[in-house]
């Protein structure tokens, strides 16, 4: 009767099917295939069940359709029931099509053990079945098993991997972040003659990019004759991920010159590059491009624009984009709130968080709470900290170790080490971040001994190992407390026992540690021996130490190098001016001041905030508009006199140098 050809839709087919008094197996199969084409999986299983009630036995055409429906609906129990039916029939049990469909069903339901068992029962699995198994392991979070199964496939004499199998294999290598394995697969691809398959080559490019094989990715990209938008976007992302944002923007310009139209992924990568390079001009051009292509309304693009403008220090433009987002998600709020804090506007971060809760009914996630607690830390208001702590407990975030660490840091910044310690003790699973937060808190308040006790307790009484950040915190704590011998011991411990390579920040703290006690010669020697060129931060620390210990000759040497690296930093000129002033070299003081004026260098406006009785008071240097300026300046003069008296009574101590 031409049942299959007569009806183009499953609705017509079902209507006609329902009017039949007697149905053949062919008609049942036709109906199920029609429903499958339209992805009406529930209907497939519903009619499959009715087929049994009509005592119509399914065949090797019926069962694969039903098993596909089970896989799509993750109905593993139903699928196992069908598997039981198949086992009772020798003909169906040996059918490759039915066996492959059972494997597909188990893979879709995440049951790889059953899928593997079923695969091993097949007499001669074809390339599709082999590829399904490789894909199944890769998609179910077992990339290593996917690679091992591919090895088994290659060893089989009766099957040859195709491009689909290889793309899946490359995806597994990408998830493993194994560039060495990626290179092996790349060689296999070339030997098998797939080197001109653009989809496969793009997958390899993505593998190299995400495995930090930067040179291999760039070289492969250059070898692609006909690059598409995926090729360009992948290599742009690779440059960004490897800290080469400026180069990423140059590649994007090459892409535009090549005539390749960017897509959403390209725009997102370029915006990340603009943010990392702080390239506001290119960011604005990319924004215009997004508007022309109608992409600005997509929440991912809008959020990336907010992030870019914030990191390019243009919060006004960031907020303008944010206000136009029709449906703001929690990621958008994270970009806005963290962006305001980055731009020194932590108070705006708190305000926007309140607006989010009251007006937008958006519930924050753990990431947003960490950002908000960070904003609160910048302000250092204790009462506000307690309010946020209550919010954290109310919404069940207190068990999150990252939020716990943020609370420890928050209370420390607010001067409440007691509350910081209570939060720390209440965290059941303390990781490195939590331990480091408490050590940092003690260090901020000059409690170096307590910081050392906490560090030693961490090392001896827990399974948590200190990382680079932990060592930076404990070194800073030792520096602030003048614990020179302990600081040097910690530095050696990091290098010799934990085999951690010090970075520039570690060396900066080490120089500060030596500079505070006047061991300037050793500090200079450290800057010469370290595997990095001295940064302005390190040289500025040295210059400050030279001023404190009145070493004018060394100060001039350091300042010369410092001004070459950063010639527009007002603070460094002030330091050198103070050195000359102490020596009575007023001509040099005048020369420096004239140089600052000629360069148009201005010192940033100093500002202080203090919270008293839940009210925030803001003080600005040389402020003549404060309503209580007279008592404020009177108190400052009185404090200044007390500080001078204390300074005169200070006891200085000598330090006997320790070798590194």
From Swiss-Prot:
Region of interest (Type E motif), ranges: 538-613
Pfam families the UniProt entry points to: E_motif, PPR, PPR_2
UniProt xrefs under NCBIfam families: PPR
Matches recorded under InterPro entries: E_motif, Pentatricopeptide_rpt, PPR_At4g14850-like_plant, TPR-like_helical_dom_sf
PPR repeats: 24-58, 59-89, 95-125, 126-161, 162-196, 197-227, 228-262, 263-297, 298-328, 329-364, 365-399, 400-430, 431-466, 467-497, 503-533
Keywords: Repeat
Gene Ontology process terms (BP): RNA modification
Protein name: Putative pentatricopeptide repeat-containing protein At3g01580
Gene expressing this chain: PCMP-E87
GO molecular-function term, one example from the UniProt record: RNA binding
Similarity remark: Belongs to the PPR family. PCMP-E subfamily.
SUPFAM superfamilies: TPR-like
Family annotation (PROSITE patterns): PPR (PS51375)
Type E(+) motif, as annotated region: 614-644
PANTHER family assigned to the protein according to its UniProt record, in alphabetical order: PENTATRICOPEPTIDE REPEAT-CONTAINING PROTEIN (PTHR47926), PENTATRICOPEPTIDE REPEAT-CONTAINING PROTEIN-RELATED (PTHR47926:SF431)
Parts of the chain that traverse the membrane: none
């Amino acid at each position: 009767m031409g049942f299959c050809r007569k009806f183009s839709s499953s609705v017509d087919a079902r209507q006609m099917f329902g009017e039949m008094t007697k149905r053949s197996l062919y008609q049942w199969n036709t109906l199920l295939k029609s429903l499958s084409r339209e992805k009406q999986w529930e209907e497939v299983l519903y009619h499959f069940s009715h087929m049994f009630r009509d005592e119509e036995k399914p065949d090797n055409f019926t069962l694969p359709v039903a098993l596909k429906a089970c896989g799509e609906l993750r109905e593993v129990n139903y699928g196992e029931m069908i598997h039981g039916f198949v086992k009772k029939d020798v003909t169906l049990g040996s059918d490759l099509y039915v066996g492959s469909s059972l494997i597909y069903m188990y893979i879709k339901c995440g049951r790889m053990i059953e899928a593997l068992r079923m695969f091993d029962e097949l007499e001669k699995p074809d390339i599709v079945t082999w590829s399904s198994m490789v894909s199944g392991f890769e998609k179910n979070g077992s990339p290593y098993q996917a690679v091992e199964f591919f090895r088994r496939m290659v060893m089989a004499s009766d099957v040859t991997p195709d491009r689909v199998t290889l793309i899946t294999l490359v995806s597994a290598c990408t998830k493993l972040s194994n560039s060495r394995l990626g290179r092996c697969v790349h060689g296999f691809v070339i030997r098998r003659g797939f080197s001109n398959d653009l989809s496969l080559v793009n997958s390899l490019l993505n593998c190299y990019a995400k495995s930090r094989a930067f040179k291999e990715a760039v070289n492969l990209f250059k070898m692609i004759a006909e690059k598409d938008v995926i090729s360009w976007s992948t290599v742009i992302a690779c440059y960004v991920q490897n800290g080469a944002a400026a180069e990423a923007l140059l590649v994007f310009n090459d892409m535009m010159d090549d005539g390749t139209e960017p897509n959403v992924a390209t725009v997102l990568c370029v915006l990340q590059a603009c943010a990392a390079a702080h390239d506001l001009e290119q960011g604005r051009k990319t924004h215009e491009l997004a508007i022309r292509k109608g992409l600005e309304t997509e929440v991912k693009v809008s959020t990336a624009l907010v992030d870019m403008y914030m990191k390019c220090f243009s919060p006004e433009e960031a907020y303008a984009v944010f206000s136009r987002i029709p449906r703001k998600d929690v990621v958008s709020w994270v970009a806005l709130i963290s962006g305001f804090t980055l731009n020194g506007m932590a108070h705006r971060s708190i305000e926007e968080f309140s607006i989010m809760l009251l007006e937008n009914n958006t519930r924050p996630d753990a990431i947003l709470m960490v950002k908000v607690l960070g904003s609160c830390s910048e302000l250092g208001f204790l009462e506000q900290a307690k309010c946020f702590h209550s919010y954290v407990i109310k919404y069940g975030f207190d068990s999150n170790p990252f939020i716990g660490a943020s609370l420890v840091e928050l209370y420390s910044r607010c001067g409440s080490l007691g509350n910081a310690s209570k939060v720390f003790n209440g965290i059941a699973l303390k990781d490195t971040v939590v331990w480091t937060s408490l050590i940092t808190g003690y260090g901020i308040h000059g409690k170096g001994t307590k910081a050392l006790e906490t560090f030693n307790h961490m090392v001896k009484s827990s399974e948590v190992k200190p990382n680079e950040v932990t060592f930076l915190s404990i070194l800073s704590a030792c520096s602030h407390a003048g614990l020179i011998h302990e600081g040097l011991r910690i530095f050696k411990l990091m290098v010799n026992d934990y085999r951690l390579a010090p970075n520039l920040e570690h060396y900066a703290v080490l120089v500060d540690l030596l500079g505070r006690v006047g061991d300037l010669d050793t500090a200079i020697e450290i800057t010469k021996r370290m595997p990095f060129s001295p940064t302005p931060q390190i040289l500025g620390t040295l210059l400050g130490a030279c001023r404190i210990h009145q070493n004018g000759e060394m100060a001039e040497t350091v300042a010369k190098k410092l001004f070459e690296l950063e010639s527009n930093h007002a603070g460094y000129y002030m330091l050198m001016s103070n050195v000359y002033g102490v020596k009575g070299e007023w001509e040099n003081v005048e020369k420096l001041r004239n140089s600052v004026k000629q360069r148009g260098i201005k010192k940033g406006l100093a500002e202080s905030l203090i919270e008293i009785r839940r009210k925030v008071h803001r003080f600005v240097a040389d402020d003549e508009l404060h309503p209580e300026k007279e008592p404020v300046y009177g108190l400052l003069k009185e404090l200044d006199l007390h500080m001078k008296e204390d300074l005169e009574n200070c006891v200085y101590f000598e330090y006997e140098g320790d070798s590194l």
